Amino acid sequence: MINELKGMYETYLKESVEVRKKAPMFAGWLGLGSDPRKHPCHEAFYDATIAWTERYVASNPDQEQVMEVASFMLETPMKYRDYDAYWFMYVAVGNIRPLIPLLAKDDCKALVKRFDELYKKHDRMPLQAETYKKLAKAAK
């Protein structure tokens, strides 16, 4: 099932890059033209990741697989920091929350450590801050 998730991320990245390539150079600047950062592909990706996470949790995955999925969701956005896709991949980090009860305590500790390495506290949006807090609580 993780291959399906990885495929969703790859497809989304490719689509967002294509949207950016096809947009006029100053599209979206000063509110003019169609801003490629507001293309429907971004919200569609986020909605799809929520649906995937719900299906995944319902499938009763084993802890090792859950850790692989959570790590993927946490680490992937930073690989694409300079792309339009970054922000919605970053928002999708919030999809780790339903996985937390399925993770071992040590896995939660490892994810908290990795979270700290990747995302500085002052850069976290409320959803990521909430995800971090839940991971930290589960790690205790």
Task: Enumerate the language-model features and the residues they cover.
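Non-catalytic all-alpha helical scaffold/repeat segments
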Residues: M1-K140
